[in-house]
């Protein structure tokens, strides 16, 4: 009898081909929403997605709220998946007594609910890591990050402070991490845990056992550092525990051959090639339960995306292009804004292309998309755009425009975590602390 870990195997031109089975009727309950054997619901995945330099207010903010909002120029690229996307306008980032760190305050506030106190550092774990602490047990990787522009530093996934989790920098590096050494075919009859992983787990256990003695000999500052270290050790042990179990491949997917090396940088033509491929690998990673939390970035804050031949590029255009007196906005910048939405759509389409249970992978995800500024020319933070996609396994309504009416951006983060079934009553700190999710979206 088949079980949900069964894989089809074969060879193609001498290479191993692996295809996971979909959630067949015999594996699901009568509604196609849960595993028949255990009654457990399909896993809900979480993803953050970062793009730099925001959008143009006159071109993206709908005039009407609710489900029947009008299509705006800069939301038009998202129309194919409009019914699965929520748009949030009228949100603000309060810096309180901190400076407005250019191109950083919006990033930190959106990702943590806290106004940053230092440039390029987060004042707590980012939202994806807070979610991963709860949902990732049993997945091979607690979380994975990827940079479409090929810079490992372009990751806005962090354990707090300067502890940013480095991003995979190319489709090949992401593929190798996910489906290279350590990825085993669970349908093999002789499947067994990797001895190297077993040895590493044993060594870590010995180190952890010596924790108490070491901590007694340290001062307060060093004890804090050791706490961070042992937290990392524990997370490594949990990952290894997952690797010592058969991986779960639960969607109708074929693991492709490794991609070729390709240029990964800020040139828009390259991003248009790389982003869909990285997105496809991200979708496969979540569909095969390699990870349940994924962070994707297409640029840094203050995006340096450029079109070959454009002497200014995106970032410089936001500061040097004059506002057209007739249009009331910067037309070149507005075009770059649209390109960002097109790249975001390519990410969502890859998630939506994988059938799973009674819907698609996107239906069983929640994607949290954020940026660094509202109006890039002056680094304004009021009106910073926020987007979510996917219904988190039916826990969030979609297809809405929500006008935040000046409320803190942290309300979106709290709403997202509530939809992910994270137990918390408030999120953020200072002026951005909130106990008010957008309850009209929660199911």
Model feature map: region roles:
Residues 1-443:
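Ligand-binding pockets and gating/stacking loops
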């Amino acid at each position: 009898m088949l079980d949900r870990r069964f894989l089809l195997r074969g060879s193609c031109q001498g290479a191993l081909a692996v295809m996971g089975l979909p959630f067949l009727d015999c594996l699901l309950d009568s509604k196609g929403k849960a595993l028949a054997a255990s009654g457990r619901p399909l896993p809900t995945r979480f993803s953050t997605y970062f793009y730099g330099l925001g959008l143009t207010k006159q071109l993206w903010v709908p005039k009407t709220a609710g489900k029947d909002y009008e299509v705006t120029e800069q939301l038009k690229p998202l129309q194919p998946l409009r019914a699965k996307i929520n748009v949030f306008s009228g949100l603000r980032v309060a810096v309180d007594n901190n400076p407005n760190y250019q191109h950083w305050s919006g990033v930190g506030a959106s990702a943590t609910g806290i106004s940053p106190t230092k440039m390029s550092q987060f004042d707590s774990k980012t939202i994806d890591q807070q979610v991963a602490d709860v949902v990732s047990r049993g997945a091979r990787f607690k979380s994975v990050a990827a940079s479409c522009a090929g810079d490992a530093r372009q990751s806005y996934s962090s354990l707090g402070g300067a502890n940013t989790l480095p991003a995979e920098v190319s489709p090949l590096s992401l593929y190798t991490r996910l489906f290279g050494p350590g990825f085993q075919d669970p349908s093999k009859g002789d499947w067994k845990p990797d001895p190297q992983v077993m040895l590493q787990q044993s060594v870590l256990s010995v180190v952890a056992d010596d924790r108490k003695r070491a901590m007694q000999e340290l001062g307060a500052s060093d004890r804090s550092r050791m706490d961070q270290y042992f937290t990392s050790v524990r997370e490594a042990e949990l990952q290894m525990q997952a690797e010592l179990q058969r991986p779960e491949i639960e969607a109708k997917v074929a693991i492709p051959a490794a991609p070729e090396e390709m240029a990964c940088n800020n040139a828009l033509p390259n991003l248009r090639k790389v982003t869909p491929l990285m997105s496809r690998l991200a979708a496969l990673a979540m569909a095969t339960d390699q990870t349940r939390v994924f962070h994707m970035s297409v640029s840094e804050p203050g995006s340096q995306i450029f079109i070959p031949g454009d002497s200014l590029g995106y970032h410089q255009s936001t500061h040097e292009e004059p506002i057209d007196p007739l249009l009331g906005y910067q037309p070149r910048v507005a075009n770059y804004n649209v390109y960002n939405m097109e790249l975001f759509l390519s990410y969502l389409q890859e998630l939506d292309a994988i059938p799973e249970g009674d819907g698609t992978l996107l239906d069983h995800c929640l994607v949290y998309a954020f940026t660094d500024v509202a109006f890039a020319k002056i680094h304004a933070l009021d009106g910073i755009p926020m987007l979510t996609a996917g219904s988190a396994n039916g826990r969030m309504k979609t297809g809405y425009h929500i006008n935040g009416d000046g409320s803190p951006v942290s309300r979106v983060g709290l709403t997202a975590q509530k939809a992910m079934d994270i137990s918390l009553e408030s999120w953020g700190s200072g002026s951005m602390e909130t106990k008010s999710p957008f309850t009209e979206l929660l199911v």
